A protein has these predicted regions:
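P-loop (Walker A) phosphate-binding loop of NTP-binding proteins
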Residues: 4
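Conserved substrate/cofactor phosphate-moiety recognition/catalytic segment
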Residues: 7, 11-63
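Conserved beta-strand scaffold positions in the cores of enzyme catalytic domains, especially
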Residues: 22-24, 97-101, 150-152
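Conserved nucleotide-binding/hydrolysis micro-motifs of P-loop NTPases
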Residues: 29-31, 77, 103-109, 158-159
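Glycine-rich phosphate-binding loop used to anchor ATP phosphates in small-molecule kinases
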Residues: 49-93
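Short, amphipathic alpha-helical "lid/cap" segments that border enzyme active or binding sites
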Residues: 51, 55, 159-170
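Conserved phosphate-donor/acceptor-positioning beta-strand/loop module used by diverse small-molecule
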Residues: 91-113
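Small-molecule kinase domains that catalyze NTP-dependent phosphoryl transfer to phosphate-bearing small molecules
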Residues: 118-165
């Protein structure tokens, strides 16, 4: 899953996991699981450590269990080099990468982020320590245009419609 915070990556991941009966590895969940709550600062270092753990789990699952699909969530993959590094590692494991670029309108993303801020939902981010993401346009501008084959999914519609559309696009993509 690739996309800015608030685009609907986690919501779509959960819905797809039910449709595909697949696993979700979420960097944000890992971060909140391995760092004591009072020390979580959402720094680049903490994000990198959490992603390293996620990738070790991913490698183990691919090497030993070979599930048909694993959704990687909680890491925006905002830069092409991040996607390329991840793809190269998956290639070593003979695993295929399907990039799903999750989008929504700026108004919807802003609304979702404000809702997160209001609810202080700690799984995804700490609004007081990472206020940059609450400037939606600035955040979107910091993302590279994806230079790899990918599926674009707009999560502005009802989740059942979005999931069905995404499911069909994935099936087209893998043919």
């Amino acid at each position: 899953m690739v996309g800015v915070p608030g685009s609907g990556k986690t919501f779509l991941a959960k819905s797809l996991s039910e449709k595909f009966n697949c696993e979700i590895l979420n960097r944000d969940l890992i971060r909140t699981s391995i760092f004591p709550k009072k020390y979580i600062n959402h720094s680049k270092l903490q994000n990198n450590i959490a992603f390293e753990v996620l990738f070790k789990v991913l490698k183990q699952l691919i090497s030993n269990n070979r599930p048909e699909y694993i959704i990687v969530d909680g890491k925006p993959f905002s830069k092409n080099y991040e996607i390329e590094e991840f793809k190269n590692e998956l290639d070593k494991l003979s695993a295929k990468l399907i990039i799903i670029h999750v989008t929504a309108s700026i108004d919807i993303i802003s609304s979702r982020l404000k809702n997160d801020l209001k609810n202080q939902y700690p799984l995804y981010r700490d609004p007081k320590k990472d206020s940059k993401i609450y400037n939606t346009q600035l955040m979107i501008n910091e993302f590279d245009k994806i230079n790899f084959p990918h599926i674009i999914i707009d999560t502005s519609s009802h989740i059942k419609e979005v999931t069905k559309y995404c499911f069909n696009k994935i099936n087209e993509f893998i043919k």
